[in-house]
């Protein structure tokens, strides 16, 4: 398939630049992946769509204030976006500047918040392809503390506005726990504490994986044929406890419901890894990077239902949804969502999808 097969027209006014004040009040498009049937709901209706004994898989990564502004020692302005924390003082980052800093170059970060000549000193240690390895000069302060002081929330480029104080809470799931993401697992933004308590009271089970979402999630696909695309790598943790819960859920005849594409990629990576090591009917713990790319023709080994936001045209995420619900069903649902003026992308509305069991498998 071609990347252009996943294009659709989206009016600019349908891009959500601010979230709903009430997380559960967003709209929910329910898509039956088996027959393409569509229902228009409110997100709080997921309480009626999820049954006792079903298992919800959440991604508990926490977004770090990963964007910093500063300058090089030579005076040139820079914008630094942390991609991955390596340890308490070193990180990999994207750096925007008129001229890329050279190895050994001194950087002064956070002067927009700390004042001129008061920036936090760092050094560009090495370059790794498009990423720069940066080390804080002062070892008495941890990177996370530095980011909390001078960092900005890394809102996606399509939101097209500076971050605001409210984004520190709004661009974070209520169950986020493990710092490391530079983008939110946005399907989870629609859950509030009250809805989670109601789901628990109904007998719905919860488990948490960790996938630290990287900035690569916003990168366009730059090839014509989707099979030629190489995914960026992101770090994943799927514990033995999660694996046990998934196996028990399947044995009980209940459903595994992934909250977000990052949860899908996490548990499907763990299942694929188990299959590659000779255990095709199992899922095993997974603590490693994943670059899994799921597109039409790829099979799902674990996930039965998916809760997800509306994604960018020609993105790997709409390709994943198309693999799950069927290409025609997905593109028709997106067409209806535009017609019905759903809100799109990170701060937008959501979908609840059950898997199309008849999608073609190429593997």
Swiss-Prot record:
Pfam families: Queuosine_synth (PF02547). Its EC number is 2.4.99.17. It is an enzyme of class 2 (transferase). Its main location: cytoplasm. GO terms for biological process: queuosine biosynthetic process; tRNA wobble guanine modification. It is found in: Cytoplasm. SUPFAM superfamilies: QueA-like. Pathway: tRNA modification; tRNA-queuosine biosynthesis. Keywords: Cytoplasm, Queuosine biosynthesis, S-adenosyl-L-methionine, Transferase. It catalyses: 7-aminomethyl-7-carbaguanosine(34) in tRNA + S-adenosyl-L-methionine = epoxyqueuosine(34) in tRNA + adenine + L-methionine + 2 H(+). GO terms for molecular function: S-adenosylmethionine:tRNA ribosyltransferase-isomerase activity. The keyword S-adenosyl-L-methionine applies. Belongs to the QueA family. Transfers and isomerizes the ribose moiety from AdoMet to the 7-aminomethyl group of 7-deazaguanine (preQ1-tRNA) to give epoxyqueuosine (oQ-tRNA). Monomer. This is S-adenosylmethionine:tRNA ribosyltransferase-isomerase.
